[in-house]
């Protein structure tokens, strides 16, 4: 893999459900077509020139050294560290990235700081063996069970079945788990049952739900506001009954 260095690693994120975050890889082989906001920003600021370049991840080789310097200074300000907002810590098929991510989790935990992990890859079984923080939480992005949809919009990511299996294994090994259910598709993109999707991951501790933005197909669906209000109600009732913590992202629910 190609490698580069950076001058800093930890930063405070403006994402509404985030705190601090790190992105120890540049690029992502999953090649999401929602479109990918991270890829758009990388192009805008000159880090990449094309989609094809984004698909070739570059590892930040001095990430652990930067954390050694930054964590002691920032420790008292950090509630948790999210991995990651502009890349994937367990990118499908990249063992070198997986190994670094596991080392980073252990490093952050050694400062008694929990991590919040999110992937479209497969959560490794070795997570149960690394240094644990009781507030660590491990998650997958899951907006459908339809593999045709996944192949269209998340072409390089792991299958939905494999993601759920790895998440279930984390749960069964006593780890906290969560789901990022965004961007959730409108029926003109993917006709599906939200309840069926929720039942498949009813064991999780936390769900983030959000509408699909920045896509002409969504805006072309004439009842998109009504649809997302209805889906928000369904997921709210489901989570209340199952005692699952829920965050519905700003802008998902529309006021009449």
Where are these regions (language model features)?
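Non-transmembrane, interaction-prone segments in cytosolic or luminal domains
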Residues: 1-5, 9-11, 17, 21-27, ...
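Acidic carboxylate-rich catalytic motifs and surrounding loops in phosphoryl-/glycosyl-chemistry enzymes
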Residues: 121, 183, 242-256
């Amino acid at each position: 893999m190609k490698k580069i260095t950076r001058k800093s690693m930890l930063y405070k994120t403006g994402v509404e459900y985030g705190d601090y975050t790190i992105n120890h890889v540049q690029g992502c082989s999953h090649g999401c077509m929602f479109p990918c906001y991270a890829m758009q920003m990388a192009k805008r600021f000159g880090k990449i020139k094309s989609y094809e370049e984004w698909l070739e991840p570059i590892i930040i080789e001095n990430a652990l050294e930067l954390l050694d310097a930054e964590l002691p200074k920032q420790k008292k300000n950090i509630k948790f560290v999210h991995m990651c907002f502009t890349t994937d810590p367990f990118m499908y098929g990249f063992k070198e990235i997986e190994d670094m991510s596991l080392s980073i989790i252990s490093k952050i935990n050694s400062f008694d700081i929990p991590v919040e992990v999110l992937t479209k890859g497969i959560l490794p079984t070795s997570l149960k063996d690394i240094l644990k923080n009781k507030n660590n939480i491990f998650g997958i992005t899951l907006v459908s069970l339809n593999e045709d949809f996944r192949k269209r919009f998340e072409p390089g990511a792991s299958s939905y079945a494999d993601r759920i299996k790895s998440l279930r294994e984390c749960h069964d090994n006593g780890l906290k788990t969560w789901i990022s259910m965004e961007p959730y598709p409108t029926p003109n993109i993917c006709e599906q049952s939200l309840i069926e999707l929720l039942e498949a991951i009813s064991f999780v501790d936390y769900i983030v739900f959000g509408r699909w933005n920045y896509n002409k197909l969504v805006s072309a669906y004439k009842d998109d506001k009504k649809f997302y209000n209805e889906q928000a109600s369904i997921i709210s009732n489901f989570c209340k009954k199952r005692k699952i913590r829920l965050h519905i992202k700003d802008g998902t629910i529309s006021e009449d």
